[in-house]
Amino acid sequence: MIEADRLISAASNQPEDVVDRAIRPKLLEEYIGQPQVRSQMEIFIQAAKLRGEALDHLLIFGPPGLGKTTLANIVANEMGVNLRTTSGPVLEKAGDLAAMLTNLEPHDVLFIDEIHRLSPVVEEVLYPAMEDYQLDIMIGEGPAARSIKIDLPPFTLIGATTRAGSLTSPLRDRFGIVQRLEFYQVPDLQYIVGRSARFMGLELSDEGAFEVAKRSRGTPRIANRLLRRVRDFAEVKHDGTISLDVAAQALDMLNVDAEGFDYMDRKLLLAILDKFFGGPVGLDNLAAAIGEERETIEDVLEPYLIQQGFLQRTPRGRMATVRAWNHFGITPPEMP
């Protein structure tokens, strides 16, 4: 099953991104959740502006859908500079990165999404650019090859990744600021859902907003996606007003349960409970049992289940927790 096909996927979706961009906060004072990140960034940005310097290079990591791109936009807005956006897979050659860097104005922000997917050749170009604001490029080939240095204006590189562990140490060490985004609390998501509903002109009760937030897996992108689908249900099946009952009916119809689990989450947990008696089970066996790639399990399915206390990673494999047994109303087998 492809991650982008899941309703509760946190993967980016192009048509939705257009709407999401319009309702994203533009400044730190509008930024909801992540209190530690917000308070730290307020200080770092104010200090850089007082000194008249570019902000230190910033690495943002965490699960998808938590607002890494939003935070990059906010930083550029707060600094009053331009934001140039690209992604790791797009920068195939050193020249691609060099072209972007040489077009930056002083203190501009260059945002590289999925920075862990940069090729080694491109990454090598980044090192002197980040440290010394210089490009060191080889011209020509063979005996005639020569190195030229190009001075760059001071700039801020913001890298975003869902896999901080995949970054090389030399790249990771060149970021002066590192911020981890955590899953959102339900009250913060409720506020985000309410704000989005006002932007979309919807009648949404506080209880309805809470129900959508509760099932959004701690992720604003999922919350906004669920809100749009609940809106569709409310307009077709009811009078367009989203109450607690309407939200619950819509989300039940969409097969998103009270914990925010969809079919794939339940399939994974039930496989561990039913086929492997709660575990431990190795990742390869689990992948074969549910017909998924091991990378999909590690990067997409597991993080939220572990964070919510339904799944454990142990040296011997994956294990379901007591909370998982209770969620499905299954009695754990007696230990021998």
From Swiss-Prot:
SS bond partners: none
CDD domains: AAA
Binding site for DNA: 294, 313, 318
Residues given in the record as ATP binding sites: 23-24, 65, 68-70, 131-133, 174, 184, 221
Highest taxon of source: Bacteria
Chemical reaction(s) catalysed: ATP + H2O = ADP + phosphate + H(+)
Broad class of where this protein is predominantly found: cytoplasm
Presence of keyword Lipid biosynthesis: no
Region Small ATPAse domain (RuvB-S), annotated ranges: 185-255
Residue stretches in coiled coil: none
Region (Head domain (RuvB-H)) location: 258-336
Signal peptide: none
UniProt keyword terms in alphabetical order: ATP-binding, Cytoplasm, DNA damage, DNA recombination, DNA repair, DNA-binding, Hydrolase, Nucleotide-binding
Region (Large ATPase domain (RuvB-L)): 4-184
MF terms in GO: ATP binding; ATP hydrolysis activity; four-way junction DNA binding; four-way junction helicase activity
Function: The RuvA-RuvB-RuvC complex processes Holliday junction (HJ) DNA during genetic recombination and DNA repair, while the RuvA-RuvB complex plays an important role in the rescue of blocked DNA replication forks via replication fork reversal (RFR). RuvA specifically binds to HJ cruciform DNA, conferring on it an open structure. The RuvB hexamer acts as an ATP-dependent pump, pulling dsDNA into and through the RuvAB complex. RuvB forms 2 homohexamers on either side of HJ DNA bound by 1 or 2 RuvA tetramers; 4 subunits per hexamer contact DNA at a time.
Subunit structure: Homohexamer. Forms an RuvA(8)-RuvB(12)-Holliday junction (HJ) complex. HJ DNA is sandwiched between 2 RuvA tetramers; dsDNA enters through RuvA and exits via RuvB. An RuvB hexamer assembles on each DNA strand where it exits the tetramer. Each RuvB hexamer is contacted by two RuvA subunits (via domain III) on 2 adjacent RuvB subunits; this complex drives branch migration. In the full resolvosome a probable DNA-RuvA(4)-RuvB(12)-RuvC(2) complex forms which resolves the HJ.
Domain comment as written in the entry: Has 3 domains, the large (RuvB-L) and small ATPase (RuvB-S) domains and the C-terminal head (RuvB-H) domain. The head domain binds DNA, while the ATPase domains jointly bind ATP, ADP or are empty depending on the state of the subunit in the translocation cycle. During a single DNA translocation step the structure of each domain remains the same, but their relative positions change.
Name of the protein: Holliday junction branch migration complex subunit RuvB
Organism: Enterobacter sp. (strain 638)
Gene that encodes it: ruvB
